[in-house]
Amino acid sequence: MSTSSSSRIAIEQNNKCVNSVAAALCPLSNCQFSGVVISAISDEQKLEFNSIYKSSCTLSCSYDSQGVLLRIMLDNDQGHVLKEYMISADTDAAQLGRRCYAVSLESDNLVLRFGSDKDQQLFRKVVENVKHLRPKSVFSQRTEESSASQYFQFYGYLSQQQNMMQDYVRTSTYQRAILGNSIDFQDKIVLDVGAGSGILSFFAVQAGAAKVYAIEASNMAQYAQQLVESNNVQHKISVIPGKIEEIELPEKVDVIISEPMGYMLYNERMLETYLHARKWLKPHGKMYPTHGDLHIAPFSDESLYSEQYNKANFWYQSAFHGVDLTTLHKEGMKEYFRQPIVDTFDIRICMAKSVRHVCDFLNDKEDDLHVIDIPLEFHILQTGICHGLAFWFDVEFSGSSQNVWLSTSPTAPLTHWYQVRCLLPMPIFIKQGQTLTGRVLLEANRRQSYDVTIDLHIEGTLISSSNTLDLKNPYFRYTGAPVQAPPGTNTQSPSEQYWTQMDTQGNRNSNSMLNGALTVNGMGDGGMDITHGLMHPH
């Protein structure tokens, strides 16, 4: 793909620190090593000295915006790349003797046996220069390399971008918020954080933006560039590959736009990246969205609880094909109840008004999102069994002309965020009028997610329940089936309601026929000529 001159200029202005590293590495970062035997270290820490490839390999090292790109090819087939890895400041590596070098690349632990001492020393310098001369970014410090690799690979697929773009509520709300506040974008400099396909950047241009810097760390950046060029807006939008924590911009911006929300608002930890981007925001600048509200409510759903409980009971079998599985029942139960449930539900399963926790994107600090401690107090509106807590979020775009809300509430049209429910392994029975107190503790981890701890207590009693869940490993339960009303919500006989409705419709049809009009499917707009007992629709 050819890169436009405007994009090339933007990339050249990127990251002064990275440029200094490139100069320091050159020519070390652009070299090849032939005759390398590559071995693997297994999870059992066993070293297999036989090559994992059918012959010795050639390693090609070339500078990349993220560090040094390592390509592996066979010596006798250098036109075909077997594997690509990124050597970054986070790469773990160690020298083994005079010719071997151990390196941990993504999920692979490799030992490289070079053909000469000199080759090993040169490769070691490449790795050490990347590690020593390039400081770890905030993103790298908080994120495991394997998690980051998986994350950016996921968002590098067009199909995943399509999934988000086809979320009509999401995409249309963003467009309306931006176009409805064109005064905030007209002739302004805009930063799009985690631009993906660049759709929000295009909205900013539609609203009159003078310049948009679209930052995207995944391979989607190349597709965004293609869209920019094919839509002839390369003079307006500059696509910059890289992470906002690691790039440099040529100027401050008036507005930051982004779609940084994950499940339960905070999952994927993209909000921290969004807040980090404020270092490029001019005083009194705008952020779209401006703040987010996480809603939390206790819920009752015996069906969901039984479903998860029965799954775990698979491990309660004492004669599964002649094998006793019961020793794993406790761990199986723990694993299933550590999974947040992603689906949707009727809000009438909620037993109290939701508690709202606000995240202010204009003023909160990145560190504020490392540990989020939310106190809870619910005044119970209906007697029943509390099976856990339900979560959803709303975000507001506070513009100069109008405020626009994007909601993932169960009362709003469904989005690709759905809602999230966290179960209690030990549900608690609670009565109307009682007060349920406690806390939700979200502790960030290096897998770009959170460990979620729930503690609930019925005030004035000794009854309590708790659970810790892994937000990185949710259970996607949504099937597309219509949401069912919770049991016990009918205040009249559904059967009688149905027949009453049918009787009413029948009476209406009879009256229509007497008046010379035929009602079809309850709509009386057909005329009838009964001269010879034949109906003739007009």
Curated annotation (Swiss-Prot):
EC top class named in words: transferase
Key words, A-Z: Chromatin regulator, Cytoplasm, Methylation, Methyltransferase, Nucleus, S-adenosyl-L-methionine, Transcription, Transcription regulation, Transferase
Disulfide bridge partners, by residue number: none
GO terms assigned for molecular function: histone H3R17 methyltransferase activity; histone H3R2 methyltransferase activity; histone H3R26 methyltransferase activity; protein-arginine omega-N asymmetric methyltransferase activity; protein-arginine omega-N monomethyltransferase activity
Pfam family, one: PRMT_C
Transmembrane segments: none
GO cellular component terms listed in the entry, alphabetical order: cytoplasm; cytosol; histone methyltransferase complex; nucleus
Compartments in which it is found: Cytoplasm; Nucleus
Catalysed conversion reaction: L-arginyl-[protein] + 2 S-adenosyl-L-methionine = N(omega),N(omega)-dimethyl-L-arginyl-[protein] + 2 S-adenosyl-L-homocysteine + 2 H(+)
InterPro entries, per database record: Arg_MeTrfase, PH-like_dom_sf, PRMT_dom, SAM-dependent_MTases_sf
Binding residues for S-adenosyl-L-methionine: Q161, R170, G194, E216, E245, T273
Processing after translation: The dimethylated protein is the major form.
UniProt cross-references to CDD domains, sorted A to Z: AdoMet_MTases
Residues of the SAM-dependent MTase PRMT-type domain: 148-457
PANTHER family xref list: HISTONE-ARGININE METHYLTRANSFERASE CARMER-RELATED, PROTEIN ARGININE N-METHYLTRANSFERASE
Role, per record: Methylates (mono- and asymmetric dimethylation) the guanidino nitrogens of arginyl residues in proteins. May methylate histone H3 at 'Arg-17' and activate transcription via chromatin remodeling.
Complexes and interactors: Homodimer.
Membership in a protein family: Belongs to the class I-like SAM-binding methyltransferase superfamily. Protein arginine N-methyltransferase family.
The protein, known as: Histone-arginine methyltransferase CARMER
Gene source species: Drosophila virilis
